[in-house]
């Protein structure tokens, strides 16, 4: 996942850990893209599909160096990542932000600092059980 906010990263990490999900945390879209390219190269070298190694991409919108819109556009335009959903997780919850996200290929939008909604979205996308109540706070 990509988020430049330390507070948001901690919340996302708690949510993913409560769900037993492995993750790579990055602080901006450029760093996330570099990590995704490494995974794609590894998948190709080992004869695996990227989707065996990357279940989804979770990204903030506003980040330095590369924002979530550009990251999403890169993921969605690269055939190596076909079938990898992108979830936008942001405090910019206006309809114009959501529409711009959809226009670059975002699969879902989850408002920031709503851990229950984030875990429900992730559980559905990852086909996992939800963590017990109280584990997300």
Label each region the model flagged.
Residues 10-18:
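Charged docking surfaces used in two-component/phosphorelay signaling
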Residues 25-56:
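Acidic, metal-coordinating helix/loop segments flanking the phosphotransfer/catalytic sites
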Residues 28-31, 67-71:
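Acidic catalytic/metal-coordinating carboxylates
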Residues 59-60:
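Active-site T/S-Asp motif of two-component receiver
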Residues 63:
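Receiver (REC) domain active-site loop signature in two-component systems and cognate sites
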Residues 70, 92-124:
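Alpha4 helix (beta4-alpha4-beta5 surface) of REC/receiver domains from two-component response regulators
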Residues 123-137:
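The C-terminal output helix
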